[in-house]
Structure formats: C-alpha cells, structure tokens
C-alpha cells in the first residue's frame, strides 16, 4: 500500500529477499495522499483507515487483554511480546513497533509488507486490529522499571547474551582450574 510504504519509508527493494530498512520519509502527508489517490485510480487496493476507526481510547480492560492475546498469538514470534522487533531467518528482522503510528500498524496487518503475512479481515477483524493496537499503546506507555531490559531486546539477542555469559563463565572456571592444578604438582 502506497500510504504505508511512503509513510514509513519502507519502500520495497528491487530484490524481494533483501530487507528494506526504514528510511526517513521525504514526503508530506498531503503528497503521500495524492500519490495514493493516483495509484488507487489505476487499480483497487486497501483503503487508508480513518483516524476514528483506529481510536483505542474507549477500549475496556477486557478488550486490551484480548488484544494482548491476539498479539501474542499472531505477532510476538517476530515482533517480541513488547513489540520491540526481533530477528527473522536469513538476516531479516521484524521492525520495532514502539514508534509506529496506529495507522501504519493497521496497514501493515492488512498488506503484509516484506516477510510479514497478510492478515485479512476474516483472520483479524477491524475490532481485533483496534484491540491489538490498544494493547501496544498500553505496553509502550508503561514505564520499564526493571533495570536492564534484556527481555525487550528479542530472543536471538537474549540467547546470545546467555551463551556468552554461560560459555564465558565455563571457560574462566576451566582456565582457573587448569592453572590451579598445574601449580599443585
């Protein structure tokens, strides 16, 4: 979708296996809307959601909890449970959703940019999408008072961190034991 690609700076690459990095957007909202209207005049496509359809301020606690479950089931394997992004196979990555607008999160669900699957309205309804977005807003607005936020980095980094600490500790202990044993003889 034109609005998502121009609005996020994640323009598709010439080779589909390459990961498109997010770039600073160079277009105003008006320019993006004009290009989107032109492309829509050529062929039908997903509509840009209205701000009212993405309003999450009136969601109840149960709906936010349901949004958390939907996100956990459909999104967290790639984006992390907090929406901070994560590693994918073959050097690709799922971007962080921390600073992504509600509109662009919704558009990404509907259009499936790059390696992301498309979530049609029969899979994730508009209400489901609002609940997921509401969950992300709630998660991102809560302060992290836990010190070193390793849990928000992602599974690959956490595993690497654990591997380095674990193996590094074993190597240090083995070296210490080897030197201690050599002196005892």
Where are these regions (language model features)?
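C-terminal capping alpha-helices of c-type cytochrome domains
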Residues: 24-50, 121-184
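Solvent-exposed, acidic/flexible segments
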Residues: 25-32, 60, 64, 68, ...
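Membrane-embedded segments
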Residues: 3-12, 18-25, 29-37
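Solvent-exposed, polar/charged alpha-helical surfaces in well-ordered, non-transmembrane soluble domains
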Residues: 30-33, 37, 65-76, 95, ...
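Second-shell loop/turn segments in exported
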Residues: 21-25, 54-58, 118
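Extracytoplasmic/periplasmic C-terminal soluble domains
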Residues: 84-89, 93, 103-104, 111-113, ...
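Short, tandemly repeated low-complexity microdomains enriched for cysteine and small residues
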Residues: 13-19, 49-56, 146-151
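Periplasmic/extracellular electron-transfer cofactor-ligation site
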Residues: 1-12, 42-49, 62, 68, ...
């Amino acid at each position: 979708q034109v609005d998502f690609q121009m609005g996020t700076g994640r323009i598709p690459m010439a080779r589909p296996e390459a990961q498109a990095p997010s770039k600073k957007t160079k277009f105003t909202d008006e320019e993006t809307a004009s290009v989107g209207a032109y492309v829509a005049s050529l062929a039908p496509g997903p509509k840009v959601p209205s701000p009212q359809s993405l309003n999450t301020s009136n969601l109840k606690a149960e709906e936010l909890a349901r949004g958390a479950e939907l996100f956990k089931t459909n999104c967290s394997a790639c984006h992390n449970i907090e929406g901070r992004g994560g590693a994918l196979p073959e050097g690709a990555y799922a971007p962080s959703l921390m600073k992504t607008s509600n509109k662009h999160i919704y558009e990404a669900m509907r259009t499936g940019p790059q390696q992301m699957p498309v979530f049609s309205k029969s899979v994730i309804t508009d209400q489901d999408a609002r609940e997921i977005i509401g969950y992300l807003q709630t998660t991102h607005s809560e302060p992290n008072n836990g010190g070193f936020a390793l849990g928000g980095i992602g599974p690959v980094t956490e595993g690497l961190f654990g591997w380095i600490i674990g193996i590094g500790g074993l190597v240090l202990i083995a070296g210490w034991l080897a030197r201690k044993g050599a002196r005892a003889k």
